[in-house]
């Protein structure tokens, strides 16, 4: 039985930062994005969200730290509401300046879920 009565949207982004910038990225994320995630979750605009340092499955180039950013939203409207939120766009400018490479981004309508 589906967890929700509708098809959600799953978003996955691979972020890549120089090791020397990873702690600063994590600090900024915790201070600036995590409170916004919690707000969106409490308002029903996020179903789930996580930021996970990659520890297996592939070996990043020496000196880089990779993260999996995973967000599940009810649909594209909530996705766009978050992406255009002023607090997020302010954070995004800082995070993009720290990234070693452009992120890898995927999203789509969730097919199966438990």
Predicted feature locations:
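Glycine/serine-rich loop-strand microenvironments at binding/catalytic pocket rims
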Residues: 2-21, 27, 111
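Intrinsic disorder/low-complexity signal
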Residues: 31, 71, 77, 82, ...
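Short, well-ordered beta-strand segments in beta-rich or mixed alpha/beta enzyme
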Residues: 9-18, 48-86
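Short amphipathic alpha-helical segments
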Residues: 21-51, 90-92
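Glycine-rich beta-strand-turn "strand-cap" elements at beta-sheet edges
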Residues: 2-6, 45-65, 90-114
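Glycine-rich loops and low-complexity Gly/Arg-rich segments
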Residues: 36-41, 72-77, 93-98
């Amino acid at each position: 039985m589906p967890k929700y009565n509708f098809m959600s949207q799953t978003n996955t982004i691979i972020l890549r930062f120089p090791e020397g910038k990873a702690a600063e990225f994590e600090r900024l994320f915790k201070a600036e994005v995590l409170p916004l995630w919690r707000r969106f979750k409490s308002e029903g605009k996020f179903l789930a969200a996580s930021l996970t340092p990659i520890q297996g499955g592939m070996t990043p180039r020496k000196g880089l730290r990779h993260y999996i950013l995973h967000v599940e939203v009810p649909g594209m409207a909530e996705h766009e509401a978050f992406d255009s939120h002023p607090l997020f766009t302010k954070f995004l400018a800082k995070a993009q300046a720290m990234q070693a490479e452009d992120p890898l981004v995927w999203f789509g309508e969730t097919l199966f879920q438990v």
